[in-house]
């Protein structure tokens, strides 16, 4: 027997039993972003490597450790996309979508990072992202957060997520703060863990994000970024907080929240949860007003967020909030007796014409009545339609309810269509 080939570690199959939950999540995401005026954009999963180096930053963990990078046959360095914002900006610049325009775009699809696989974190993962270009006030930051808040309400997880906010100010303000932070950390260099020592000079703000308890204790006395912010940056942040408060959205200010990508400025936010064990981030985003220019476009204000869909699905399953998922099959058509197969397939197509949303499975592969009913029950259908020789002769169909106590009945095909239509409303 040939050796079995398995999926790559950290890259998972989504099986038919799992797909309905994903489809429900995707449906809600699409409905909500459409209600806010966003349009879908689809980008390739492979990009030139230097796109991510320029956008994310060469000294970030993503670029240094996590990207899947390879040379193609022409010797060009290509990478599987580790996130969606850089690709979305590249597409907007390339196709002239951003200059002097307000653009609202969203995307959904697989991303790739070579991380250690663990619960809710995979090497191929799916991300839902929303990006807005052309508006630079705190009002659009607030609206994006309101959009995510609406999603949590629709998914039923509002009580299980917490909004954390921070502001990173402008690049010049961060530069002054970086100098002060490095000067402070140098006093404790020997006490820092290896990762923080490495980051101290290459990307010192990331030290604030360290999970090491000793490092966190050292940071208690560190300079505050807020003390280095100018009036405009502080006013932007205060404006955002006022809008969130007026909308009834609770938040926590987390001055250690810096995000792992270099392109952010001003507003950054994360929605975090404790429902998956250790605190995990479900959704994160912020402003990146300099990224479009950094990638070759005209100066364009921008803000966006992304959420990990695996984590969202895992939350719904963990909290048992996926019980209203529609089964894959609504109705199972059983055909019993001589000459019923041809009539059965004609009936099935008639039902699909009349009821396009009906999920109808026709029995195939032969078998007696008992076997067909067993398959009908296993399919998850609520109703079995039974077409026997008598039903074919009389132009009727027998309706058997597989879930609940309703009595079996034999009706005309038109009556069956009306009954199924009423149940689907």
From Swiss-Prot:
Gene3D superfamilies: Anticodon-binding domain, Bira Bifunctional Protein, Domain 2
GO cellular component: cytoplasm
Catalytic function, reaction form: tRNA(His) + L-histidine + ATP = L-histidyl-tRNA(His) + AMP + diphosphate + H(+)
UniProt-listed Enzyme Commission number(s): 6.1.1.21
Keywords: Aminoacyl-tRNA synthetase, ATP-binding, Cytoplasm, Ligase, Nucleotide-binding, Protein biosynthesis
Primary location recorded for the protein, binned into one broad class: cytoplasm
UniProt xrefs under PROSITE patterns: AA_TRNA_LIGASE_II
The keyword Aminoacyl-tRNA synthetase is assigned to this record: yes
InterPro entries, per database record: aa-tRNA-synth_II (IPR006195), aa-tRNA-synth_II/BPL/LPL (IPR045864), Anticodon-bd (IPR004154), Anticodon-bd_dom_sf (IPR036621), His-tRNA-ligase (IPR015807), HisRS-like_core (IPR041715), HisRS/HisZ (IPR004516), HisRS_anticodon (IPR033656)
A GO BP entry: histidyl-tRNA aminoacylation
Family in the record: Belongs to the class-II aminoacyl-tRNA synthetase family.
Subunit text: Homodimer.
Name of the protein this chain belongs to: Histidine--tRNA ligase
Organism encoding this protein: Aeromonas hydrophila subsp. hydrophila (strain ATCC 7966 / DSM 30187 / BCRC 13018 / CCUG 14551 / JCM 1027 / KCTC 2358 / NCIMB 9240 / NCTC 8049)
Phylogenetic classification of the source organism: Bacteria, Pseudomonadati, Pseudomonadota, Gammaproteobacteria, Aeromonadales
């Amino acid at each position: 027997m040939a050796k079995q080939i398995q999926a790559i570690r950290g890259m998972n199959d989504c099986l038919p039993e799992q797909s309905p939950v994903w489809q429900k999540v995707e449906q809600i995401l699409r409905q909500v972003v459409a209600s806010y005026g966003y349009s879908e954009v689809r980008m390739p999963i492979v990009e030139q490597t230097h796109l991510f180096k320029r956008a994310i930053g060469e000294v970030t963990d993503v670029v240094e450790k996590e990207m899947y990078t390879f040379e193609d046959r022409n010797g060009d360095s290509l990478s599987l996309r580790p996130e969606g914002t850089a690709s979305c900006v590249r597409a907007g610049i390339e196709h002239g979508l951003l200059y002097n325009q307000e653009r609202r775009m969203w995307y959904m699809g697989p991303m790739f990072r070579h991380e250690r696989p663990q619960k809710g974190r995979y090497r191929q993962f799916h991300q839902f992202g929303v990006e807005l270009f052309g508006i630079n006030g705190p009002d659009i930051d607030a609206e994006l957060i309101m959009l995510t808040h609406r999603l949590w309400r629709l998914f039923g997880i509002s009580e299980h997520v917490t909004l954390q906010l921070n502001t990173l100010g402008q690049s010049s303000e961060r530069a002054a703060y970086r100098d002060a932070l490095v000067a402070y950390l140098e006093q404790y260099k020997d006490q820092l863990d290896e990762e923080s020592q490495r980051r101290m000079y290459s990307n010192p703000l990331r030290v604030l994000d360290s999970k090491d308890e000793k490092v966190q204790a050292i940071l208690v006395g560190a300079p505050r970024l807020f003390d280095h912010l100018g009036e405009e940056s502080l006013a932007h942040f205060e404006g955002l907080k006022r809008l969130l408060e007026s909308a009834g959205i609770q938040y926590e200010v987390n001055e250690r929240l810096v995000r792992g990508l270099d392109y952010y400025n001003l507003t950054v936010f994360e929605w975090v949860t404790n429902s998956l064990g250790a605190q995990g981030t479900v959704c994160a985003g912020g402003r990146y007003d300099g990224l479009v220019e950094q990638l070759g476009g005209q100066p364009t204000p921008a803000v966006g967020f992304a959420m990990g869909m695996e984590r969202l699905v895992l939350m719904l399953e963990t909290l048992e909030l996926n019980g209203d998922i529609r089964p894959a099959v609504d109705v199972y058509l059983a055909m019993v007796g001589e000459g019923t197969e041809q009539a059965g397939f004609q009936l099935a197509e008639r039902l699909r014409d009349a009821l396009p949303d009906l999920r109808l499975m026709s029995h195939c592969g032969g078998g007696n009545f008992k076997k067909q009913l067993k398959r009908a029950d296993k399919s998850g259908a609520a109703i079995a339609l039974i077409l026997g020789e008598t039903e074919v002769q009389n132009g009727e169909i027998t309706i058997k309810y597989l879930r609940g106590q309703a009595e079996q009945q034999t009706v005309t095909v038109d009556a069956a269509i009306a009954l199924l239509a009423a149940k689907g409303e």
